[in-house]
Amino acid sequence: MTYQRVLLKLSGEALGEPGTGHGIDPDAVRLIARQVAKVARLGVEIAIVVGGGNILRGAEFSRLGGHRANADYMGMLGTVINGLALSDAIEDQGLETRVLTAIE
């Protein structure tokens, strides 16, 4: 069975440092980008949804006393940061990317 389009959901922790899942590990990002490029070169269209838990978890920040709405926005910004990091790495593989967000 072959697919023309796939959706890849990545936890933000998949982009993080080994052992902790925090921050952004350039080696992890490059590895994922190479794997995505390999599949894309087979003619598969790939949409990627990436989390931001490696940067900040809004619920955790809120529990520590931050305003919930701000905490949620901070978490969403983490997803954008991850998306941009992954986008750069995929473009370095010669593919075209687009980062989309609902943040206003």
Feature map (PLM): residue ranges:
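Nucleotide/pyrophosphate-binding catalytic subdomain
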Residues: 1-104
